[in-house]
Each structure stands twice: as structure tokens, then as C-alpha cells.
Amino acid sequence: MDFYSNLDSRSLDSETPTLFEIISAQELEKLLTPSIRYILVHYTQRYPRYLLKVANHFDELNLAIRGFIEFRQLSHWNSTFIDKFYGLKKVRNHQTISTERLQSQVPTLLEQRRRLSKTQIAVSLFEIVGVPYLRDKLDHLYDKLYPKLMMNNLDPKESLKTFVQYYFLKLYPILLSVLTTIQVLLQVLYLSGTFKSPSIIMWLFKMKYARLNSYDYTLDEQRVNKFLNKTSPGKLGTGNNRIRPITLTESLYLLYSDLTRPLKKGLLITGGTLFPASIFLLKFLEWWNSSDFATKMNKPRNPFSDSELPPPINLSKDLLADRKIKKLLKKSQSNDGTCPLCHKQITNPAVIETGYVFCYTCIFKHLTSSELDEETGGRCPITGRRLLGCRINKTTGEWTVDGIRRLMM
């Protein structure tokens, strides 16, 4: 699945992955459990009868299922599900062996010696599945007990239970800070090339990251062929010394192998395409939730924020011939600081879309006047242009006015 990675392996080191690849894989790893939980909760609300018990025991089920999947990946590829997507694997860290020289001379022997041991596989499985599970449980316990500590309801001298809870609340944040500091320090040393292990557990158990190569894919092809040919019909009746015909049991065995072989191929094809597609979906959801594009798409449209405004609609010739309109137009041409509506000095100035300034109370009363109909109302009293922020409720006949902006003088 490393072919689905967005990294060009030709421009990178053929042996040691970069820290940014490792961090990217770890960030994607953290998205798996919350994404599955979100999908499960969504469908639990629709079908609570069938999924409520599953949702209540999600942590344990996720631990078991993901543990099985990751164990298979670590046993076959020495890589986790996400690391394989990025073309990464874990190998033994032989500090006394020159891997570059052996890689060019005896690559197969080197790859065999670098395969993870059973202990290292178990430790890697615990790091991927067990550590996040314990972290979630401890965080939940800390959030549950912390209010008791703030209310002084935990007396360490009362009982052994309260003693453990009290010092857990005191030491747990310190322990997390120390582990985080060590983790960051190891990553900095890995970035500088001093250390080959970017995490505490990998450093303690002498493991490091490497890239998947032709040896891993050849080994996988051998496993696939063995899996498909496990019940191959060619194994029956091919001997030269065989005289008797095929028995009923052997006929059923051949029928079973003919039926299961397409199913096995379909299972392999589905696993090879469905899982990478789900990872691409997770990456898309991560981008969607973190980008401004999603915010703009979910934001309701504002009629005043459109870049292309509709052209203004002027009053008809009959309305423009009105003496009152002509008087307002003539009055607005004077720049004496008076309101065109009340003809007094402007108080509490407000501007409308056409740029003319009025008293706030005057322009608001004018635009909300019930005497104006849909044709004459909702317009600038000076230019006669229709205002976008004025809308009439045809049921009640009342005007809704937006777009009046007060001026700070």
C-alpha cells in the first residue's frame, strides 16, 4: 500500500525514513479510533437496538479487532497498518553491523537478520494498540477524580484507595510531561542523525524504522501463493503410481478448493483496495475539517457579502415626477449637514447603501413606514434605488430593514 503514499520515494533516502514521514504516519494513526467511534455513534443513534451494546464496549472491541489486524501486519510485514501505507517498517537496530555494505553484498541475509523477534512484535503491538487504550482510560480516570481534588474531598490518610487516587492525580501530569519531553528529545536526536529510534519504546527494545523493499514484497508474494494454493486441486491425483479413481472425499475436497479459491482472491483484492481507500477518506476528512473551505461551504450565504451585486433598480418615471422626490433630490445636493428627511441638523448619523447620510431615526422610520407598498418602499429616499437590505413580509405587510450603518463621528 506504500504506492498510495503521497511521497516520492525516489527523492528520499533508500534506508532511513524522514522524521516528517514518521510524524505524518503517527498523526494518521491517531485519527483511526476517533473516526471509527464517530461513525459508530452516528449509526447507533439510528439503530440503537442493534448497536448500543457495541458502542458501550467500543474501547474493548476496538482493542481486540485492531490488535488482531496490527498483529497480522507486524508478523507479515514488520509494519503497522498505517506504516505500511507510508512504505515504512520496523527492523532490528544492529549498531555494530554496517547495513549499507551488507545491503549491497548479501541483502537477503541482512533482511532476515533484521526481522523483528516475537518480543519486539509484542512490544510494537503494545505501543500501537495498548498505549493509546491505557492513555484513554487514565485520562478518563483523571478527569473523573480531579473535581474531588479541587473540592478537597480526597484525604490520602483516609484509606489506601484515596491515598492511591490522591498521588495519582499529583504524579500523572508530571509523568506525562516527562515522557513527552523525552519523546521530543529523541525526535530531535533522530532528526539530527544521532539516534535511529524516534520513540522511547523503540529505543529501549533496539528497533528503528526502515523502508519497505523488494525483499518484503517477494516474501508477501510467497505468502499469497501459499495461501491460494493451500487447497490446490493439483495436489491430488498427480502421482504416476496412482491407479485407483478419486474417492468421494477427494471430490468434495476438490470442489471445496474450487469454491474457496475465488473467495480468497476476492478477499485479497478487497483488502488491498478497501483499506487504502479508507485511509484516503480519513485524509480527506482531516483536510476538510482543518481547511477554511469547509467553513465557507457550511457558512450561510450573506446577501451583503456577495462580490457581484445585482444592478440597482431606479424609480419609474411617474415616481420621479413626484414633487416630494424632486424636493428631496434638490435638498440632498446641499452640503450643510442637515438631514434630507427632517431638514434639521443630523443627530445620530447613519448611512445607507447608496452613501447618503440621515438621522438614524428618520431613515429607519422612513424605510419601515407601512404607507409604502412593494413598489415604492425599500428604496433610497434620495436616488430612488432599491436597497438590498429592505424586504417586505407579504403576509403582515411589514418591512424588515437591514444595512443601515451608524457612523462614529
UniProtKB/Swiss-Prot annotation:
Give the boundaries of each RING-type zinc finger: 339-384
Instruction: Indicate the secretion signal residues.
Output: none
Q: Does the keyword Manganese apply?
A: no
Residue ranges of the TM segments: 19-46, 51-75, 118-152, 156-192, 274-301
Instruction: List the Pfam families hit by this protein, alphabetically.
Output: Pex2_Pex12
**Would you tell me the Gene Ontology cellular component terms?**
peroxisomal importomer complex; peroxisomal membrane
Query: What Gene Ontology terms for biological process does this UniProt record contain?
Result: protein import into peroxisome matrix, receptor recycling; protein monoubiquitination; protein ubiquitination
Cytoplasmic side of membrane: 47-50, 153-155, 302-409
Provide the membrane topology annotation: Multi-pass membrane protein
Q: What does the UniProt entry say about where the protein is found?
A: Peroxisome membrane
**Main site of residence?**
membrane
Q: In which pathway does it act?
A: Protein modification; protein ubiquitination
Q: What InterPro entries does the record point to? A: PEX12 (IPR017375), Pex_N (IPR006845), Znf_RING (IPR001841), Znf_RING/FYVE/PHD (IPR013083)
- Which residues are exposed on the Peroxisomal matrix face of the membrane? 1-18, 76-117, 193-273
Provide the binding site for Zn(2+): C339, C342, C359, C362
Q: Which SUPFAM superfamilies match?
A: RING/U-box
Q: Which UniProt keywords apply?
A: Membrane, Metal-binding, Peroxisome, Protein transport, Transmembrane, Transmembrane helix, Transport, Ubl conjugation pathway, Zinc, Zinc-finger
Keyword hit for Zinc-finger: yes
Q: Any idea which GO molecular function terms this record carries?
A: ubiquitin-protein transferase activity; zinc ion binding
The domain comment in this protein's record states: The three subunits of the retrotranslocation channel (PEX2, PEX10 and PEX12) coassemble in the membrane into a channel with an open 10 Angstrom pore. The RING-type zinc-fingers that catalyze PEX5 or PEX20 receptor ubiquitination are positioned above the pore on the cytosolic side of the complex.
Subunit notes for this chain?
Component of the PEX2-PEX10-PEX12 retrotranslocation channel, composed of PEX2, PEX10 and PEX12.
Family to which the UniProt record says this protein belongs: Belongs to the pex2/pex10/pex12 family.
For this entry, the protein name equals Peroxisome assembly protein 12
